[in-house]
Amino acid sequence: MGHEWIDAEREFKWSEDVKVESEVTEIVLVRHGETTWNAAGRIQGQIESDLNEVGLKQAVAIAERLGKEERPVAVYSSDLKRAKDTALMIAKTCFCPEVIEVPDLKERHVGSLQGLYWKEGAEKEPEAYSAFFSSQNDLEIPGGGESFDQLADRSMDALEQIAKKHKGERVIVVTHGGVLRAIYLRITQASSAGKLLNASVNVVHLRDQKWIIDSWSDVSHLSSVGFLQRGFDGDAKP
């Protein structure tokens, strides 16, 4: 059997004309630190709730972790206070001059469920509670709430705009459990996103116009601080 010879010079010249390493944009998605309402089991939605003592410690811990990694070119945040407070801590440690607020990164509006305790949602607002856990993605939650599709559309649009502005760069985005769940499900087309933990690190890459999950729900930096094991789970009723 004869050998197949390769023209090495031709092969080398061809490879020079091809970009072997695709440009990768890295977005580090962070869920805000624990709040008073998280700890109490209350449904926040778009209602403001402050970071509690544990949440403040979590913000410090995640800021210290990210400060030791590759420096981001920018820090973005939801315009809700719990996310902004977490983002400000990260920005300071990562030597970023400001936190850029993006309203479309805010938590899902969950209608008449907002302000209730999870344990009373099914009894006090059965229609809204059912809509929240429904697999019908275009179903809006009664009381002015958003459908899953509305949440996912604005969340992914915000992510796309950030990635477009920072091609080939690394940025940090601080947001919410519902937004993280929507992003995960849109990217993976999975049926469940599992638990979204406070102050978790979730990394996504955009390469060749395709989103890829690099790592998800990493809380290794919280070993000495602790976190709510139940997290946020929009797929399972409490």
Curated annotation (Swiss-Prot):
**Where are the disulfide bridges?**
none
Q: Does the keyword Hydrolase apply?
A: yes
Q: Which Gene3D superfamilies match?
A: Phosphoglycerate mutase-like
Q: Which UniProt keywords apply?
A: Hydrolase
SUPFAM superfamilies for the chain: Phosphoglycerate mutase-like (SSF53254)
Site positions (Transition state stabilizer) are 176
Q: Name one Pfam family in it.
A: His_Phos_1
Q: Which GO molecular function terms does the record list?
A: L-phosphoserine phosphatase activity
Q: Which reactions is this enzyme annotated as catalysing?
A: O-phospho-L-serine + H2O = L-serine + phosphate; O-phospho-D-serine + H2O = D-serine + phosphate
Q: Which GO terms describe its biological process?
A: D-serine biosynthetic process; L-serine biosynthetic process
Per its UniProt record, what PROSITE patterns does this chain match? PG_MUTASE
Query: From what superkingdom does this record's organism come?
Result: Eukaryota
Query: What EC number(s) has UniProt assigned to this enzyme?
Result: 3.1.3.3
**Which top EC class applies here?**
hydrolase
Query: Catalytic residues?
Result: 32, 107
Q: Does the keyword Hydrolase apply?
A: yes
Q: Which CDD domains match?
A: HP_PGM_like
* Similarity comment text for this entry: Belongs to the phosphoglycerate mutase family.
Reported function = Phosphoglycerate mutase-like protein lacking PGM activity, but having a low metal-independent phosphoserine phosphatase activity in vitro. May be involved in serine biosynthesis.
According to UniProt, the name of this protein is: Metal-independent phosphoserine phosphatase
Q: Write the lineage as a comma-separated list.
A: Eukaryota, Viridiplantae, Streptophyta, Embryophyta, Tracheophyta
